[in-house]
């Protein structure tokens, strides 16, 4: 993948993408504004409680990755993203694609119907079919894929889609997504559906979930180490 983001980096990039469109008068954003945006109680999943120092540390990492840039304001430093559609970047997305990616970064896996409803402040999709077409494009782009379809949950009519910007987790999710796409093809031809294929799909999806949880444990362990170091000081 072109970008490998941890949970905090994904939240910061998502907030910058969101506010650039929804509140352009407040963009670029200050550290305080970004911290408030990251910790919003609505339109965020999971809800985070990041300190300004944690957000600043995340900004420093993103600066090193050249995914954001800073500029001096009248009184404070302000930040804008270089994640996509920037002057020197090669990652280009349409307004519809930006809206979908932003919501996936801020709220995690969602169905096409949920995305259509929740993106209305950034982009007005005509219907769910247009949302699904945008997701399909993002999953098939030659410079991607950028999203993946997850296994459909029991009792649900729609499958959820997940962003692919997290390294090893993305690889595992992509494998699960390919299995899910094969399952959709089989559903269109019931005679070709076999129980062992469903078992393989469930196994792959579980492996992807385990990989995602392992990544979260690693991130929490690093944060705990940082806290212990600060306490020792």
From Swiss-Prot:
Pfam families: DUF480 (PF04337). Coiled coil: none annotated. InterPro entries: DUF480 (IPR007432), WH-like_DNA-bd_sf (IPR036388), WH_DNA-bd_sf (IPR036390). It comes from the Bacteria. SUPFAM superfamilies: Winged helix' DNA-binding domain. Belongs to the UPF0502 family. NCBIfam families: PRK11239.1 (NF008413). This is UPF0502 protein YpsIP31758_2048.
């Amino acid at each position: 993948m072109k970008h490998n983001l941890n949970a905090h980096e994904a939240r910061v990039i998502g907030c910058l993408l969101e506010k650039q469109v929804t509140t352009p008068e407040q963009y670029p954003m200050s550290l305080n504004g970004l911290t408030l945006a990251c910790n919003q109680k609505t339109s965020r999943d999971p809800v985070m409680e990041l300190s300004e120092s944690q957000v600043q540390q995340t900004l420093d990492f993103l600066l090193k990755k050249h995914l954001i840039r800073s500029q001096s304001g009248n009184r404070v430093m302000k930040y804008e993203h270089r994640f996509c559609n920037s002057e020197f970047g090669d990652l280009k997305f349409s307004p519809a694609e930006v809206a979908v990616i932003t919501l996936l970064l801020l709220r995690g896996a969602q169905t096409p119907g949920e995305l259509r409803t929740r993106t209305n402040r950034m982009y007005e999709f005509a219907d769910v079919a247009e949302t699904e077409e945008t997701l399909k494009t993002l999953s098939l782009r030659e410079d991607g894929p950028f999203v993946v379809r997850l296994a459909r949950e029991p009792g649900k009519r729609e499958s959820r889609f997940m962003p692919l910007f997290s390294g090893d987790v993305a690889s595992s999710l992509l494998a699960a997504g390919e299995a899910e796409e094969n399952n959709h093809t089989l559903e269109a031809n019931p005679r070709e559906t076999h129980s062992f294929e469903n078992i393989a799909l469930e196994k792959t999806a579980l492996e992807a979930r385990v990989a995602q949880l392992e990544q979260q444990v690693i991130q929490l362990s690093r944060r705990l180490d940082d806290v212990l170091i600060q306490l020792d000081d």
